């Protein structure tokens, strides 16, 4: 059963009424089944209408939905022969960032991304997708490996931001983020990044400075969370909705600003309502972007990437 968000309360109420009618209709009442069908049509229309005009803050809530597909779901959906590669060869293996070798269609790729986890135990293990320095250093190692063997890099971004703990700072969090961003820009192979949920600050761009940046329709991408922005500007997190509006966090706004190259449509009601369709759409979009970049020389790829990010702002 779908977990409904706060703004979806009218839809949830309709669905509860439909379930109630259908459980009663099991006794054989055709009139009740007919009424349930009418309510189902009304619910579907309400869902479409609601998602056609989401505010930036509502999109932020959708991007954070616990049932949205995560890195492991995407890998299982469109990467075959996946072979995970662990560790930064310096300190530890950070499970907030996962990466490895695999195939996207007939193309060999290096795939890297944030994993948030899907239950309490896995969320703790993956630190809710908030990477530490060793996570970004693992990403650097895998990108350098891909460059050495001529493999395109695919990055899936879904993080509220890099982990801000004191131990992470002591181990050089800022330096690791900067080096990872630099590693993206220095690649001589094609790189495609996709923001699939939250794209939070440097923790996101550290693995997203790519030739082509994709973004799901209801994903968000920003320098700070709306709550964080509100607490700084208004001294209260209650202004998060206003902050989300002001920061232009949505895919449509960011495409207009040139930060995002392509917006990938989601199923009606968000990726969490039809994960298989969302995963298939993203896999196809990434494949198309890699096709466009195939055959380009390393110098051209680096120059295009550099020019793209220098032009932002």
UniProtKB/Swiss-Prot annotation:
The parts of the chain that form a coiled coil are none
Gene Ontology CC: acetyl-CoA carboxylase complex
**Is Transferase a UniProt keyword of this protein?**
yes
Q: State its location(s).
A: Cytoplasm
Listed InterPro entries: Acetyl_CoA_COase_a_su, ClpP/crotonase-like_dom_sf, COA_CT_C
Under Gene3D superfamilies, the record lists: 2-enoyl-CoA Hydratase, Chain A, domain 1
Question: Which key words are in the record?
Answer: ATP-binding, Cytoplasm, Fatty acid biosynthesis, Fatty acid metabolism, Lipid biosynthesis, Lipid metabolism, Nucleotide-binding, Transferase
Record domain CoA carboxyltransferase C-terminal: where:
42-292
What catalytic reaction does the record list? N(6)-carboxybiotinyl-L-lysyl-[protein] + acetyl-CoA = N(6)-biotinyl-L-lysyl-[protein] + malonyl-CoA
Which cysteine residues pair off into disulfide bonds?
none
Q: In which pathway does it act?
A: Lipid metabolism; malonyl-CoA biosynthesis; malonyl-CoA from acetyl-CoA: step 1/1
- Set out the biological process GO terms recorded for this chain's protein: fatty acid biosynthetic process; malonyl-CoA biosynthetic process
| Main EC class the enzyme belongs to | transferase
Q: Which GO terms describe its molecular function?
A: acetyl-CoA carboxylase activity; ATP binding; carboxyl- or carbamoyltransferase activity
Q: How does this chain assemble?
A: Acetyl-CoA carboxylase is a heterohexamer composed of biotin carboxyl carrier protein (AccB), biotin carboxylase (AccC) and two subunits each of ACCase subunit alpha (AccA) and ACCase subunit beta (AccD).
* Task performed by this protein: Component of the acetyl coenzyme A carboxylase (ACC) complex. First, biotin carboxylase catalyzes the carboxylation of biotin on its carrier protein (BCCP) and then the CO(2) group is transferred by the carboxyltransferase to acetyl-CoA to form malonyl-CoA.
Per its record, how is this protein called by name? Acetyl-coenzyme A carboxylase carboxyl transferase subunit alpha
């Amino acid at each position: 059963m779908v977990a409904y968000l706060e703004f979806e309360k009218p839809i949830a109420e309709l669905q509860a009424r439909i379930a109630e009618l259908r459980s009663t209709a099991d006794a054989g009442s055709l009139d009740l089944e007919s009424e349930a069908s009418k309510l189902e049509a009304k619910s579907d229309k309400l869902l479409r209408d609601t998602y056609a005009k989401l505010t930036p803050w509502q999109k932020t809530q959708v991007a954070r939905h616990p049932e949205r597909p995560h890195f492991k779901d995407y890998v299982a959906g469109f990467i075959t022969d996946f072979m995970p590669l662990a560790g930064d060869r310096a300190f530890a293996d950070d499970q907030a960032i996962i990466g490895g070798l695999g195939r996207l269609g007939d193309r060999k790729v290096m795939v890297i991304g944030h994993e948030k986890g899907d239950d309490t135990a896995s969320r703790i293990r993956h630190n809710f997708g908030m990477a530490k320095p060793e996570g970004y250093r693992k990403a650097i190692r895998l990108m350098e490996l891909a460059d050495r063997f001529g493999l395109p890099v695919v990055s899936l971004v879904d993080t509220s931001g890099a982990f801000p703990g004191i131990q992470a700072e002591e181990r050089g969090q800022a330096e690791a983020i900067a080096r990872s961003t630099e590693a993206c820009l220095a690649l001589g192979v094609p790189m495609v990044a996709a923001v699939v949920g939250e794209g939070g600050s440097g923790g996101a761009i550290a693995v997203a400075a790519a030739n082509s940046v994709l973004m799901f329709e209801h994903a968000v991408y920003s320098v700070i969370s709306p709550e964080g922005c509100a607490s700084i500007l208004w001294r209260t997190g209650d202004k998060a909705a206003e902050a989300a509006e002001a920061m232009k966090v949505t895919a449509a706004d960011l495409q207009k600003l040139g930060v995002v190259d392509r917006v990938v449509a989601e199923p009606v009601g968000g990726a969490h309502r039809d994960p298989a369709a969302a995963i298939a759409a993203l896999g196809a979009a990434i494949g198309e972007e890699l096709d466009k970049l195939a055959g380009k020389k390393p110098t051209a790829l680096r120059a295009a990437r550099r020019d793209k990010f220098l032009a932002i702002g």
